[in-house]
A protein has these predicted regions:
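Conserved small/polar residues in nucleotide/adenosyl-binding loops
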Residues: 196-199
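Aromatic (phenylalanine/tyrosine) cluster motif
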Residues: 32, 39-41, 64, 144
Length: 199
């Protein structure tokens, strides 16, 4: 350790090097990383932000060795609150976090132009949400475990629309299919196949 001491404790500004190659440069309080500081991990990751009693706390940016990045709030060492995660693939999530997971309200942008905007539970699209497809199609409704499940509306680019129940990403249950030409089919669906058509 190189830095300031007060009463035999690391206090103020200092640098600490671990045997595994990790390093912290920043503020200390009573032997704890506390305040503003940068932690360089042995695996190439880096965290630049606020600390409280050796834990990431408050605003901070975590740079992953693979090129991914998280910029947002932390609590007790975990992503918590509002934050943006950028994957090396080009995908990006902007929204709420809880206990290191996408949780609450948020939007996930994909490199192909598609995006999901809605509710999340433990890294899964779950609750109410809208998925905008890159080809112009759109689904608005309920989700469970990253799949369309419950009540929802799917609109195709050509103007066709399905309003009804979904299960496991497929039209399943009671629903109405509206054709762009004005025709409609109403009835029961099983795994995206309509059986009881009523015109």
């Amino acid at each position: 350790y190189k830095g300031d001491w007060v009463n035999d404790k690391k206090q103020g500004w200092g640098t600490y090097d671990w045997q595994d190659g990790s390093r912290y440069e920043g503020q200390w309080n009573g032997d704890y990383m506390h305040g503003q500081g940068v932690f360089y991990y042995a695996n190439g990751d880096k965290y630049d932000g606020q600390w409280e009693n050796d834990h990431k706390q408050g605003p901070g940016i975590y740079y992953f060795a693979d090129g991914s990045k998280y910029d947002g709030q932390w609590e007790n060492g975990k992503k918590q609150g509002q934050g943006t995660y950028q994957w090396k693939s080009g995908s990006r999530y902007e929204g709420q976090w809880k206990n290191d997971c996408m949780h609450g309200q948020g939007t996930l942008y994909h490199p192909d132009g598609s995006k999901y905007k809605g509710q999340w539970v433990n890294d899964k699209q779950q609750g109410e949400g809208i998925y905008y497809y890159a080809n112009g199609c759109r689904y608005e409704g309920q989700w469970f475990d990253d799949k369309k499940q419950g009540q929802g509306t799917f609109t195709w680019v050509n103007g066709d629309k399905y309003v009804g129940q979904w299960m496991n990403d497929r039209m399943h249950g009671q629903g109405i299919y509206y054709h762009a030409d004005g025709n409609k089919y109403e009835g029961q669906w099983v795994n995206a196949v309509s059986y009881t058509h009523l015109t």
